[in-house]
Amino acid sequence: MSRLNNLYKKMIEYDRGDPKRIQHFVKVHSFARLIGQEEYIDDHTLYILEAAAYVHDIGIHPAMEKYGRDDGKLQEQEGPAEAEKMMKQLGFEQDVIDRVSYLVGHHHTYTNIDGMDYQILVEADFLVNYFENHSETDTIKKSVKKIFKTETGIRIATEMFFPEEFQMSETWAQDGLQELDDFIEAQGIYIRQ
């Protein structure tokens, strides 16, 4: 059994009785993995990204226990130690633990994003949160424009939440050629055939 699969199972155990949290990290992991693969990140970075996607919200339970709330900053504050403890128990390498802990401690901070693993984790979390929080289309468009950087993340957000921007007429190719012909004719250019 791979360490990532063990982490997956351990997180299900950690969040037992809380299907919303389990569903959330499973979806974030799925989007993160897809975006990472489509953006051709290296295997080690993908490994870190996948681990971080599983544990990114691990600070929610300790924040609720200590403070009675679980806002993003408290998740960032409480999550790294929990992630580190779990990952050490499962035998993850220290460099992986350190980077995952950093990502857990910053995944609600959208400035100074320093790496594709961080960028993709943020995008994957947003993709899931937009749906789970029933976000307004204008809010989604603004945040995608401001925060998303990967072609894959932008494409997924657009296709999922505002597909009308991707729809083409059935005659789009013919229409494009006709527009080109009209332009050429308007310029007085004649092409010999």
Regions inferred by a protein language model and the residue ranges of each:
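Acidic/histidine metal-binding catalytic segments
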Residues: 41-49, 90-104, 117
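An active-site-proximal "capping" alpha-helix that borders the catalytic cofactor pocket
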Residues: 28-31, 73-89
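Divalent metal-dependent phosphate-bond-processing catalytic cores, especially two-metal-ion Mg2+/Mn2+ enzymes
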Residues: 13-26, 30-42, 55, 92, ...
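His-Asp-centered metal-binding catalytic motifs of divalent-metal-dependent phosphohydrolases/nucleases
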Residues: 46-68, 79, 101-108, 125
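Active-site flanking loop/helix segments enriched in acidic
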Residues: 3-27, 59-70
